[in-house]
């Protein structure tokens, strides 16, 4: 336990030294307006907006991310089932699958899976 604590202190100390060293060695540079402005074929942009944002693409990405996390949570359960085959583990897996399928059906019924709303 003492070794782990000393190792933790050592890592924090090295990180702090590197951060302070970076702060003192780096040179403060003035920002030049011409160098920091975007080059767009010789004219200044009217707005400072970023690239266009597609809301359906974002919603589809969020649904994919949530579904992917659910699958990642499901994988260890499969390995657990291999080692213990009790009724509780089967019940746990079936409840998880029912929730997963129910959310998929709800997304489908509410037309969240369509690309254009």
Curated annotation (Swiss-Prot):
Pfam families in UniProt: Oxidored_q4 (PF00507)
Question: Record's GO cellular component, any one?
Answer: NADH dehydrogenase complex
Name the coiled-coil region(s).
none
Q: Membrane-crossing residues?
A: 1-21, 58-78, 86-106
Q: How does it sit in the membrane?
A: Multi-pass membrane protein
What keywords does the record list, in alphabetical order?
A: Electron transport, Membrane, Mitochondrion, NAD, Respiratory chain, Translocase, Transmembrane, Transmembrane helix, Transport, Ubiquinone
**Superkingdom field:** Eukaryota
Q: Which InterPro entries match?
A: NADH_UbQ/plastoQ_OxRdtase_su3, NDAH_ubi_oxred_su3_sf
Query: Which reaction is recorded as catalysed by this protein?
Result: a ubiquinone + NADH + 5 H(+)(in) = a ubiquinol + NAD(+) + 4 H(+)(out)
Give compartment(s): Mitochondrion membrane
GO MF annotation terms: NADH dehydrogenase (ubiquinone) activity
Specify whether Cytoplasm is a keyword of the entry.
no
Presence of keyword Repeat: no
| EC number annotated for this UniProt entry | 7.1.1.2
Protein family per UniProt: Belongs to the complex I subunit 3 family.
Summarizing the function annotation, the protein's role is: Core subunit of the mitochondrial membrane respiratory chain NADH dehydrogenase (Complex I) that is believed to belong to the minimal assembly required for catalysis. Complex I functions in the transfer of electrons from NADH to the respiratory chain. The immediate electron acceptor for the enzyme is believed to be ubiquinone.
This protein is called what? NADH-ubiquinone oxidoreductase chain 3
Annotated source species: Apis mellifera ligustica
